[in-house]
């Protein structure tokens, strides 16, 4: 599944893997773009899979003509040895009938690389919140039992809120509860897979709605940065530290031509 660009096939076992869910507003994918662009993480390989919608484009992180000619595909892997960080960026949808196959291949690769921890950036429909979720922070997290012990104190100190469980049958049986992440794509099932495989994995997500989700990506990344310290903040202001890719200038298309006025 993973095809390296160079001779390196795997990663050292102390690396952290960051990846996005393909979820509402593409918040996780936008946040991953910011990480790659800000830290200038070089590409080390890509995923060869038939589980994603085929896609190819120009390099989204380069603005000069020469480097922008480099092609990007639907699933690429980046690595930054100085921070022991690996990043997987997904740029197209998972084919519905192949979602399970994709998750299995992803889990298999994670196990082979023996990543120290895996962090999935995701989002969830804001309109599905219950009354208790309408107040306070819009961020939630989930951690697998394998990771719980090592991060429990840190997350408690950060005052993060765990994703609440909701009734499986509202109004009929409130005793049976489950984790429900509407609009989260493969988030819930991938989390369940990691629990079954005893992987050290965490989900960090934000409640949001479809629209201009760039601010959601910035805020989600700031939340993650409190834990991982990817970039240093100055006087508590970390927003200015994130660098948006040049390709974001065309996020909503080119400007209106003056001739129409």
Curated annotation (Swiss-Prot):
SUPFAM superfamilies noted in UniProt: Cgl1923-like (SSF159659)
Coiled coil region boundaries: none
GO process annotations (BP): chaperone-mediated protein complex assembly
Key words of the record: Chaperone, Nucleus
InterPro entries the record matches: Proteasome_assmbl_chaperone_2 (IPR019151), Proteasome_assmbl_chp_2_euk (IPR016562), PSMG2_sf (IPR038389)
Modifications the protein undergoes after translation, according to the UniProt entry: Degraded by the proteasome upon completion of 20S proteasome maturation.
Signal peptide feature range: none
Subcellular location: Nucleus
Source species, domain of life: Eukaryota
GO cellular component: nucleus
Subunit structure: Forms a heterodimer with psmg1.
Entry similarity comment: Belongs to the PSMG2 family.
Main function: Chaperone protein which promotes assembly of the 20S proteasome as part of a heterodimer with psmg1.
Name of the molecule in the record: Proteasome assembly chaperone 2
Upper classification of the organism: Eukaryota, Metazoa, Chordata, Craniata, Vertebrata
């Amino acid at each position: 599944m993973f095809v390296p660009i160079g001779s390196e096939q795997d990663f050292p076992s102390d690396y952290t893997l960051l990846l996005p869910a393909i979820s509402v507003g593409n918040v996780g994918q936008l946040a991953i773009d910011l990480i790659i662009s800000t830290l200038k993480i070089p590409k080390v390989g890509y995923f060869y899979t038939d589980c994603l919608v085929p896609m190819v484009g120009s390099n989204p992180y380069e603005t000069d003509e020469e480097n922008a000619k480099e092609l990007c595909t639907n699933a690429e892997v980046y690595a930054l040895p100085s921070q022991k960080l690996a990043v997987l960026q997904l740029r197209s949808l998972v084919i519905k009938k192949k979602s399970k196959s994709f998750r299995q291949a992803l889990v298999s690769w994670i196990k082979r690389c023996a990543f120290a921890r895996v962090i999935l950036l995701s989002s969830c429909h804001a309109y599905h919140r219950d009354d208790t979720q309408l107040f306070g922070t819009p961020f939630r997290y989930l951690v697998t039992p394998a990771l719980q012990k090592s991060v429990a104190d840190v997350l408690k100190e950060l005052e993060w809120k765990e994703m609440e469980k909701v009734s499986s049958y509202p109004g009929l049986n409130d005793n049976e509860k489950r984790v429900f992440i509407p609009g989260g794509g493969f988030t819930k099932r991938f989390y369940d897979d990691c629990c079954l495989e005893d992987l050290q994995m965490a989900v960090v997500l934000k409640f949001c709605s479809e629209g201009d989700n760039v601010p959601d990506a910035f805020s989600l990344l700031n939340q993650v940065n409190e834990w991982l310290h990817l970039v240093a903040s100055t006087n508590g202001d970390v927003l200015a530290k994130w660098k948006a890719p040049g390709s974001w200038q065309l996020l909503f298309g080119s400007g209106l031509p003056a001739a129409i006025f």
